[in-house]
A protein has these predicted regions:
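Catalytic core of tubulin tyrosine ligase-like
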Residues: 240-245, 253-257, 262-439
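Hydrophobic/aromatic beta-strand patches that form the interior of the parallel beta-sheet core
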Residues: 108, 127, 159, 188-190, ...
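Generic detection of intrinsically disordered/low-complexity segments and helix-coil linkers/edges
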Residues: 17-18, 250, 396
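Residues immediately flanking
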Residues: 111-112, 249, 332
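Short, flexible, glycine/charge-rich loop motifs used to bind or transfer phosphoryl groups or to couple energy/partner
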Residues: 96-98, 234-235, 263, 318
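Conserved beta-loop-beta/alpha segment of the NTase-like Rossmann-fold superfamily
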Residues: 184-284
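N-terminal glycine-rich phosphate-binding loop and ensuing alpha1 helix
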Residues: 3-188, 196, 207-225, 229-233, ...
Length: 469
């Protein structure tokens, strides 16, 4: 039997978690070692503090005062509407293109989610989204990166953050597809961390088996710790990478390594730049960027009443207009700063139903949505915004850049996303002088063209044929 360090027992006793050892004598040596390793990695005192705070009626932050203090973001680069605006965007694009040529850019894709909500029992990145082919989300992003490499004659490392649920299958999928010709040595898979679920009533850590804590991913804010623990921040520094283009797996129309966005980020020496789009209505379920007491923050839609969401400022502009696309550019040194003190990103509480093993060793599966049995903990990457000294917000072109796949049907579904990909393709063809019926699907690989100008030139030269689109 594996001897238990007295310090471990003391910590478990102090934090009311001694139940974690209830089946220890029944476990094999390897199972004992695994359980003790999980316990050793867990900050038991912090979890106890968070649970106690979650049981208080009041919030540690005065939510009402926070919303009242919110203002429309002040430092925003809006979409161009004048010749001067267009010139500014052109100059930013040139700066961004130079950053790409100099090899200072890498891509981070957050790919920890399964496609369950789409009726797809695999990592969401493997979901086929091409309007005419079975091109997957992973393939679309890989082809964008490869096309950027070819255009700017540069290296662009691709960092893919997986979860325990998606890591193995993602690795196998990329290997089977030869990393879409990017080269295995430039694609880095790394796994986000996990945190235990707590019993909502008692604060006790739940167990999923006799030897395992009930763990769940630690949220996209776990990116910072995951990059550091995988040694990737050091690797990026060695390769002189300065800018990390961050996006989530579910948006096939994101413009990866967007030169204009990179250019504005570099010009302003921003530590954290965020792409936003104007909400379609105050009721749209999107987090929004705002200024609160001189800092950039995100207010989640769930924090706002319908009346607050529709509030306008003195100019008649919605205060809460700037919808978060989850497209960011991080300064690498800023991520290193965050990694040096992980406590800067707070843990958030979500009440969920979580299956667990009870004191008799039987599995219980709660299913009362009105009274969730557990507390899950996660970090949000956008909590880095108020920590940064220099932030920037850039308004994107919503119809071009933000068409996510989140739901099985209706808004933000595979149907709407494929329709957007086809529409963008038809618009590019129209710019090249080819009219395509609105009901005809079009699919343009990034390797055929990254934008309308490139498509026009390649159709004219014969490098791309209309029949191939």
């Amino acid at each position: 039997m594996n001897p238990i360090n007295s310090d471990v027992r003391d910590r478990l006793t102090e934090t009311s978690q001694t139940h974690l050892l209830r089946f220890l004598s029944e476990l094999s040596t390897s199972e004992q070692e695994s359980l003790l390793h999980q316990i050793g990695k867990t900050d038991l005192r912090l979890l106890r503090q968070i649970w106690k705070a979650s049981t208080n009626d009041g919030s540690p932050i005065d939510a009402a005062a926070r919303i009242t203090a919110a203002r429309s973001p002040g430092k925003v680069v809006r979409q161009p509407v004048s010749a001067a605006d267009s010139e500014r965007w052109k100059q930013a694009t040139q700066v961004g293109e130079n950053e790409l040529r100099e090899g200072r850019v890498a891509v981070i894709t957050v790919a920890g989610g399964q496609g369950s909500r789409l009726g797809f029992d695999h990592p969401k990145g493997m979901f086929p989204i091409g309007p005419k082919t079975d091109r997957t989300l992973f393939q679309i992003f890989a082809e964008q990166i490869l096309a950027r490499r070819q255009r700017y004659h540069t290296a662009i490392p691709w960092l893919i953050m997986t979860s325990d649920a998606t890591h193995a299958e993602t690795h196998t999928f990329l290997e089977e597809h030869n990393y879409f010709n990017l080269g295995q040595d430039s694609v880095y898979l790394f796994q986000q961390g996990s945190l235990p679920a707590l019993d909502a009533a008692s604060g006790r850590i739940l167990m999923s088996s006799r030897s395992e804590l009930a763990l769940s991913p630690d949220g996209h804010g776990g990116l910072v710790a995951a990059l550091a623990s995988a040694g990737l921040l050091n690797l990026l520094s060695q390769h002189n990478i300065r800018h990390l283009f961050y996006h989530q797996i579910d948006n096939p129309t994101v413009i990866l390594c967007d030169p204009a966005l990179l250019g504005f980020h570099a010009q302003q020496r921003s530590q954290l730049t965020t792409n936003v789009v104007r909400k379609e209505s105050p009721a749209e379920r999107m987090g929004v960027l705002v200024d609160i007491n001189g800092r950039t923050e995100i207010v989640e839609y769930s924090e706002l009443t319908p009346e607050q969401a529709a509030c306008c400022d003195e100019n008649g502009e919605w205060i809460f207009w700037a919808g978060n696309t989850a497209i960011h550019i991080f300064d690498r040194e800023f991520l290193e700063q965050l990694a040096a003190d992980e406590s800067q990103l707070p843990l958030h509480v979500a009440r969920k139903n979580v299956g667990f093993m009870d004191d008799r060793g039987e599995i219980v599966r709660p299913d009362d949505p009105a009274n969730p049995n557990a507390i899950k903990l996660e970090k949000f990457i956008f909590d880095a915004l108020p920590i940064a000294e220099r932030t920037l917000i850039v308004e994107g072109n919503r119809s071009r850049e933000f068409n996510p796949v989140k739901n099985r049907s209706g808004a933000d579904s595979p149907d709407t996303s494929r329709a957007a990909l086809s529409r963008i393709g038809r618009e590019w063809l129209a710019a090249a002088g080819y009219e395509v019926p609105a009901d005809q699907p079009v699919e343009i690989s990034p390797l055929q063209a990254l934008d309308a100008e490139e498509l026009t030139a390649r159709l004219k030269s014969g490098a791309v044929r209309l029949a191939d689109l």
